[in-house]
Amino acid sequence: MEFLKSGIKTVLGSTEPGQQPSAAETVEKLVDRVYSSTLLEDRRDACRALKALSRKYRIEVGAQGMPPLVQVLQNDGQDAEIISYALDTLCNVVTSEEFDEEADNPTVSVNVGEQFTEMFIKTPEHVTLVMGYLDEYDFRVRRAAIQLITSLISNKTRELQDLILVSPMGVSKLMDLLTDSREVIRNDVLLLLIELTKGNSNIQKIVAFENAFDRLFEIVREEGCSDGGIVVEDCLILLLNLLKNNSSNQQFFKEGSYIQRLSPMFELSQDAEEVGWSPQKVSNFHCLLQVVRALVTPSNQQQVVAACQRVMQKSRLLHALCEILMSSGVPADILTETINAVAEVVRGDRDNQDELGRVMAPSSPPRPAIVVLLMSMINEKQLLALRCAVLYCFECFLYRNADGQRAVVQTLLPSSASDVSALSTGQLLCTGLFSTDALANWFSAVALMHSLVENVALKEELLRVLLATPGGQKPITLLEQCTNLMQQERYRLQSKVGLLMLLSLWLAHCPGAVKALLETQGTMAYLTAQLCSNEHDEREFLVQGMCAFLMGLCIQFNDNSLPGQKREDISQLIIKRIGQESFCSKLAEVSRHEAYSRACKQAQIRAKSAGELLLDFEYCKLYKGLEALIAKLVSGFDVDGIELTELTLSSEASALVSQYKGIIRGMDAQIQALQQSSKELEQENAELKEKLGEEQSLKAQLLDQNTLLKAQLGASTGQVQSAQGAEATPPNEEELNAARYQANMYFAENIRLTKELETLRQQLSAEKQSADAAQDSLAAMQKDQEDLLELLADQEAKLTRYEEAGSTNTLPTSNVAPSVPAAGGGSPIPSGTASR
C-alpha cells in the first residue's frame, strides 16, 4: 500500500504538510495529467495510478476518468502497457462484482457497474474500439479486452449483443480466440461466449456455423471429458446455450454427427464406484445430461426430437444412460437428471420405449428397470425430486405406447398372474395407491391414470380388476375400492386429488366405467355433499371443482342404462340440490387454482415441496377439453325436465314437427359438408404453414451462410488490397472469384426463396379467407337451425295448449249431444261422427 501511495505521489507531486487531497481531487489531477501530458511515460503513469484507485474509488474514477481512458485507447494503441492499464481500469469501473476495498464505501450502489456500462456504450464506437484490441497478441491487452467485453455483456446483454452483431467480423474474432495457445485467454473467451450467446438465436447460429461444435468437443477431449476440470463445464454450458430452443442449431448438431461424439462421455469406468464422484465431475455430468435433454425436450419441433431420438438409440447413447441408471454409487442429483433424460429420449418413440422395457436391474432375482424405478417412486424415504423424475419417466414410457399400457393393465388382471411371488408394475401401483403415505397415493394414482390415456379398451379391461378383501369376503373391483377410499375422512386431500384425477380420466369416453361408478354405493351422495358444503380453504375449492367435473362426466358419458341414474336424473339432482350456477362456479374452480396453471405448462412434473403436487398435465388437458361442454350441458336442462314426444301430438302437429325435422336434417347435412370443407381447408392450411416454416428455416440458414460468405469475401478483399500494389497470385484470385460466385449463387437462391415465400403467403391468405367464409356460412346455418328449433318449441307449446283447451271445451258437450235422423230413415248418427 505504501508503494502505491508513493507511486501516486510521484505522478502528482508532493503536497503541503497537513493537506491531504480528497479522492475526487486526486482523480481529477490524474485525469488532467492523462489529457495534458505530452510524454507517453507521464500518461502511462497516470493510467497506472487510475487503475490502482479504481478498485476503492470506483465512482470518482468512472465519473471523471472514462473520457480520457477512451482517448488513450484511440491515440496510444502502439503502447501495449498503457492500453492494458486503460482496459483494466475500465473493467474495474463497469464490473458488477463488489471489491473488498469498497466494502465500507456507502456511496457505491449495487448496480453502479451497470450504470457505468450504460454510459460507456452510449457511444457504439467505444465497443468497436475495444473489439479492435482483440487482434492484439500481447497477453495483457488481449486478456483485458476480453474481460472488459465480458463485464459489459453481463451488465447489458441485449445491447452488447446488437453492437457485436454489427461490428465487422465481431463474432468471428471471438471464435478465433478459442484457438489461442494460451489457456488463460481461451478460458476467458469461453466465459465471454457463454454470456454472449444467452437468448440470442442469431448469435447462436453464427457461433455454431463458425465451427464451434468441433472446437468445443476438441477442448473437452483435451481436458479429460467428463473427468476434466471446470473448463469442461464451461464448454458444456456454452454448448447448451447454442442448442437450447434453437431448432437450426439442433438440426446442424444432429446432421454433423455430434450426438455420436456425446455417447462415449457417458461411459463410466470400471472403478467409478471405488474412485467416487468428485464435485466437478458431478457438475460436468449434469451439464452433459442437460445437453442431451436440450435436443429431445418435448417443447422442440417434433421432427427434430424424433430424429435425435433415433440417433441416440443407434449411437447407444440411450444404452449408456440406462447403464448409469442401474449403476451403484451414482449421486442422487445425477441419478435424478439421468432419469429425466431417459424419459425424454424414449418419449413417443416405440423402439426406445421397447429398449427401456427390456433393461434389467442387476438384482437377485433380476427385475425390469421399470419395476425397480416404481419401487423407488412409492418409497417415502426417497428424495422428492427422484420420485418426481421416476413418475415422469413412467409417463414418457407409456406415452403413445399402447403395448406398454396394456402390459401394465394385464399385470392387474387375475389371469395374468403367472408368478405370484414376482413383483409387477400393477402390484406396485396398487401398493402405492393403498399406502398410508399420501405422496405414494398421488404418485400411484397418476401413474395408473397414464396407463389409460387415449385407450378406451383398457378402461373397460380395468373394470374387471378384482381386489381381495380381509376376512375372505367377496372381492371388490378396483373402481369400487377407489370410491371407498375417496369417501374416507382419514384419506388426505392430496390422496383424494390423485383419486379424482384417476377416476375422471377413467370415466371420460367410457360409458361402462360411468355405469360402474353410478352403481357403487354412496358415490353420488358423497359428490353431492362435497358440492353442497361451504368450504373456504383454497385446496377444498379445488376438490369441489374436481368433484363437479367427475359428476359432469357422469352426465356427459352416461348411456342411460341405469334406472334412476340417467342423464336427466343426475341433472335434476344438480338443479335441485346444488343449483346450476353454483355447480358451474365450482366446476370453474379447477382452472382458477395455481396448481392448474403450473401443470398446464409442461408434461414434466416439477415441485419444490410435496405440497405442490396436485394436478397432472394429462388431467388438465382433459379438463380443458370438456369443462365448457359440461357447463353448457348442465345449464341447458330445465327445472321440470319434461320433454314432449311425437306420440303426444296430433297428426297435424306431428306433420309440422316432421317438416321442421326435415328442414333441420337438411341443414345438418349442409353443416356437416361445411365442417368437412373447413377441416380440409384447415389441413391444407396446416400443410402450407409447415411448408412455409420449412422455407423460412431454409431461408434463415441461407441468410446465415450468406452473412458468413460476405464476411469471408470481405476478408479476402482486404487481403488483396493490402498486398501493397503487388499483383494477386492466381490461387488467391481464383478463391476470390469462387467466393464471389458462391455468394452470387446464394443471393439468387435467396431471391428465389423470397419469391416462393411470398407465393406461399398469398396462398395461405387465400386459404384463410376461404376458411373464414366457410366458418361464417357455418355460423349462419347454425343460427338458422337454432331459430328453427326455437320456433318448433313454440309451435309444440301452442299445440299442447290448444289440445288441452279443446279437450276441456268439447268433452262435456259430447255426452249430451242430440241424435240427428239419418237420411232414408236409417239409425241416428252421433254429432261427433258427423262433424268428423
Swiss-Prot record:
Residues 817-836 have a biased composition (Low complexity). It is a peripheral membrane protein. Belongs to the VDP/USO1/EDE1 family. The gene is p115. One of its GO terms (biological process) is intracellular protein transport. Essential for maintaining the architecture of the Golgi stacks and for normal organization of the transitional endoplasmic reticulum (tER). Required for both the formation of the Golgi stacks and the maintenance of the individual cisternae. Keywords: Coiled coil, Cytoplasm, Endoplasmic reticulum, Golgi apparatus, Membrane, Repeat. InterPro entries: ARM-like (IPR011989), ARM-type_fold (IPR016024), Armadillo (IPR000225), P115_Arm_rpt (IPR041209), Uso1_p115_C (IPR006955), Vesicle_P115 (IPR024095), Vesicle_Uso1_P115_head (IPR006953). Residues 1-22, 803-836 are annotated as: Disordered. Disruption phenotype: RNAi-mediated knockdown results in a loss of Golgi stacks and affects the organization of the transitional ER (tER) sites. Golgi stacks break down and form clusters of vesicles and tubules. The Golgi stacks that are present have an adherent morphology, including a decrease in stack diameter and total cisternae (stacked and single). The tER sites lose their organization and become dispersed throughout the cytoplasm. However, the efficiency of anterograde intracellular transport is not affected. This is General vesicular transport factor p115. It is found in: Cytoplasm; Golgi apparatus, Golgi stack; Golgi apparatus, Golgi stack membrane; Endoplasmic reticulum. It holds the Pfam family Arm_vescicular. Residues 663-707, 744-806 form a coiled coil. One of its GO terms (cellular component) is Golgi apparatus. Residues 12-22, 806-816 have a biased composition (Polar residues). The lineage of its organism: Eukaryota, Metazoa, Ecdysozoa, Arthropoda, Hexapoda. ARM repeats lie at residues 24-64, 65-124, 126-166, 169-210, 211-256, 316-359, 368-413, 424-463, 477-518, 523-577, 579-636. SMART domains: ARM.
